[in-house]
UniProtKB/Swiss-Prot annotation:
The modification N-acetylmethionine is found at M1. A zinc finger (C2H2-type) spans 343-366, 373-396, 432-454, 460-483. It comes from the Eukaryota. This is Zinc finger protein 280B. May function as a transcription factor.
Length: 543
């Protein structure tokens, strides 16, 4: 009889004297399975671990083997004696539950088919009427078990102790919900049912099911903890402080809610981690391509120099003399009644193929109050804003100011600004300005000869502005030196190279029926000034 008792007490007494380790390992992961508060009769609750292939059959709870009653009776007395020996004196006064939980490293090495037994620590007169759960294979007996013990004398407060395989004195430590979560910072936390962080579960593909009996004591001060792990995702469950009472959890509903929240969180994280393409800064065309430069800023000394006309022998000051010469040459040209008179613009002196095109040019460019589809540098009109923007991108640079006053180096993107500047700032001086190429003369005779040359000869028209030159060399020097970015727009200051900028004619569509605003995207690297060509190469080309 004694020999049979020794054979029967192999598995569980060894489990009760297992070593308990301090729960301070950073890699340890606590998995709370369930606690049962029993007043009279305790039932053994089997927590099944389903493998990847087949779930555990729950009929094992109802399995009855021959001689099981005698084994339970004998083992009950042995377990009571062992519990009395192992229980410290202070255990009667401490109102806590000792929960033995394996570290994560041991849980990972444990076979997925090993059972987990939850059993109460009973009084000496405690009667165990539930069937004993025996492992399937004898080789699994030494495998670590998770044991939940529960005090029946006092209100319950949770205490967790980590047990190891080797034998050592038992260490118990009361832990709050915050301490349990702070043991392993990698462990997932639940707040308001939303998963925070990634859970490093030991069984990513297994499913843990906890079967609890209905208790008559209601639960108070329930806190959220991790008691279920399904397919690697944690579920919120009740973690009590005073009384223990678990209700059945609708896993299907919780799973659906958890999946929906996970989808929302994944979309939010994608929006945060994904770096979307930033919107390009919007700059108006007038601010990006047009500008003015005041030059030296010092007014020229007034000399009140007079100039004598070679045709009518009139003596006039510089500005009036310039107007007088213009009227003389226009009158002479009109008397010839040539075809050029009907196709040349009297404002910009540009020639057009037909008089109709000349008339359209005058109406769109020189008579319109505020033309929106006109390039102010070229003084040419375009059909739409989009065509104008494309023209500006292909032919001009940001801050391009090709019209220069050669007296004080005043610059502008608009020819009329330079002409007005000369007539106001350089009036009554010794300088004469050519309206075709902005060249400066000091005497009347060379000025009138130069002026007649522009009328009589086929001038070299600059393809990027309205200026005309008598020689090809002068035209190329002008294009190389003046058609560059003279001043960087304020909107581009501080922007790194290769920055994309959106150019628009206006912020709102000008036409009532249109919805979209015409725009074009340019790179700041395209606006960098190019090196001017040497004069020697230009002179060779002119010959």
């Amino acid at each position: 009889m004694e020999q049979s008792c020794e054979e029967e007490k192999e598995p569980e007494p060894q489990k009760n004297i297992q070593e308990t380790k301090q729960v301070d390992d950073e890699d340890a992961e606590l998995i709370f399975v369930g606690v049962e508060h029993v007043n009279e009769d305790a039932e053994l609750i089997f927590v099944g671990v389903t493998s990847n292939s087949k779930p555990v059959v729950s009929n094992i709870l109802n399995r009855v083997t021959p001689g099981s009653w005698s084994r339970r009776k004998k083992y009950d007395h042995l377990r009571k004696d062992t519990a009395r020996k192992l229980q410290p004196k202070s255990h009667e006064t401490v109102t806590s539950e000792a929960v033995t939980v394996l570290p994560a490293s041991q849980l990972e090495s444990r076979s997925t088919d090993s059972p987990i037994i939850i059993e109460p620590l009973s009084k000496p007169d405690y009667r165990n009427s539930s069937p004993q759960v025996v492992p399937n294979n004898s080789s699994e007996l030494p495998s670590p078990l998770i044991t939940f013990t529960d005090s029946l004398h006092h209100p319950v407060s949770t205490a967790l102790s980590v047990g190891g395989i080797n034998e050592s004195p038992r260490v118990s430590k009361q832990l709050s919900t915050f301490e349990v979560n702070s043991i392993n910072p990698k462990r997932a936390k639940l707040r308001d049912g939303i998963i925070e962080g990634n859970s490093s579960a030991s069984f990513p593909s297994d499913t843990f099911h906890t079967m609890n009996t209905q208790q008559s004591t209601p639960s108070n001060n329930v806190h959220t903890s991790l008691s279920h792990v399904q397919n690697g995702a944690p579920f919120p469950a009740a973690f009590p402080k005073d009384n223990i009472h678990f209700k059945p959890i609708n896993t299907n509903l919780d799973r659906a809610n958890e999946l929906a929240k996970t989808d929302i969180l994944s979309l939010t994280s994608q929006n945060k981690t994904f770096d979307p393409k930033k919107e390009n800064p919007i700059v108006l065309l007038s601010d990006f391509y047009y500008g003015q430069h005041k030059g030296e800023g010092q007014p020229e000394q007034k000399t009140h120099t007079t100039f004598k006309c070679l045709s009518c022998v009139k003596v006039l000051k510089n500005v009036k003399f310039m107007n007088h010469v213009k009227h003389h040459l226009e009158f002479e040209k009109q008397r010839n009644d040539s075809w050029e008179n009907h196709t040349t613009c009297q404002h910009c002196h540009r020639q057009f193929p037909t008089p109709f095109q000349l008339q359209c040019h005058i109406e769109n460019v020189h008579t319109a109050q505020e033309p929106s589809t006109v390039c102010k540098i070229c003084e040419l009109s375009f059909e739409t804003d989009q065509v104008l923007l494309q023209h500006m991108k292909d032919h001009h640079k940001p801050g391009e100011m090709p019209y220069v006053c050669q007296v004080c180096h005043y610059r502008s993107s608009v020819f009329a600004d330079v002409e007005t500047h000369f007539r106001t700032c350089h009036e009554n001086t010794k300088n004469l300005l050519c309206p075709f190429c902005l060249k400066i003369f000091k005497t009347a005779t060379p000025y009138m000869c130069h002026y007649r040359g522009h009328w009589g000869k086929s001038a070299h028209q600059c393809s990027k502005c309205r200026l005309q030159f008598l020689t090809f060399k002068e035209k190329m020097e002008h294009k190389t030196q003046c058609h560059q970015m003279f001043k960087k727009p304020k909107q581009l200051e501080g922007l790194p190279p290769e920055t994309k900028v959106t150019i628009q004619v206006s912020l709102e569509p000008l036409q009532p029926g249109s919805v979209d605003v015409a725009s074009i995207t340019v790179s700041t690297s395209d606006s960098e000034p190019s090196l001017p060509r040497s004069k020697s190469k230009i002179s060779k080309k002119s010959h």
